[in-house]
Amino acid sequence: MEKTVSRKVVVLAILLSLSCLCIAKASKGEEKTSGELRDVTPQRGGPCSYDNLCHNHCPGCKITQCVNGECVCLICYTPPL
């Protein structure tokens, strides 16, 4: 009886450690994905002197910024299908 209980405890410990590894790998994959998205070259629009002016040049963007006098589209709007 004691051997059965100890075996069950060992099996549960192994399953718990494997699930922790799976969670760690999944969170690492999310970090990689978000890093890849940040590396995408942003769209660039016309000249600007401040951020609000960029919405006129980049109407399809959710977030625009004026970077070094040029409008940069950071997140493009994609309509739902």
From Swiss-Prot:
It comes from the Eukaryota. One of its GO terms (cellular component) is extracellular region. Residues 1-26 form the signal peptide. One of its GO terms (biological process) is defense response to fungus. Disulfide bonds join 48-66, 54-71, 58-73. Keywords: Antimicrobial, Disulfide bond, Fungicide, Plant defense, Secreted, Signal. It is found in: Secreted. Belongs to the DEFL family. This is Putative defensin-like protein 265. It comes from Arabidopsis thaliana (Mouse-ear cress).
